[in-house]
């Protein structure tokens, strides 16, 4: 990722503020940010209320510490995806973080969704499972701990929707891995979050746009809880 892009003048305030908060947390021995968010949800969210969990995570991100969740600004995009998916879709998420997007997709798409979410961080797995439990969605969302490149080959069946929101340099190789293992089929929708210029998404975008395998749409957005330009790429396997 082109980290220098985060140092451009329009992005500098966000970058320095986030780095300051991370340093303070490290020096004071605070838990990782996902675990802080988990504790906040347990304290303030209403059990069994998915929207309350999302609202509480939004409040944490706006008032306590920034979170790299999708945030509320992209909920309309998730709702739009429902029109492209069959009833009771199988969803694969790469990158759980705090469980925000898993909860949002389960709440906004279809009550019969079944989501498998792969996450490499143990803290993120713990936080995601706890937040999903508070939301009352543990029976519909499964979290798998491990590197995506190791877990993907162990998956079975096909997925109607794939949500990419993990390490950006893994977007392209993991998508190709999903293809080679037959985990996506014609009509499968692949949503790649954070493909704005700041994330140096060119290898992934070049692949979905020019491989001839996908129809694809680019939607502008902002990085969650900021005004920094971002984008989402929505691709459908032909």
Which residues fall in each region the model found?
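Conserved SAM-binding loop and adjacent beta-strand
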Residues: 46-49, 63-77
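Conserved SAM-binding motif I beta-strand of class I
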Residues: 114-119
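Conserved SAM/SAH-binding beta-strand->alpha-helix loop
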Residues: 121, 167
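S-adenosyl-L-methionine
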Residues: 122-158
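N-terminal auxiliary segments of SAM/dcSAM-dependent transferases
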Residues: 1-49
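Conserved class I S-adenosyl-L-methionine
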Residues: 88-97
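C-terminal substrate-binding/active-site "lid" region of AdoMet-derived donor-dependent transferases
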Residues: 170-238
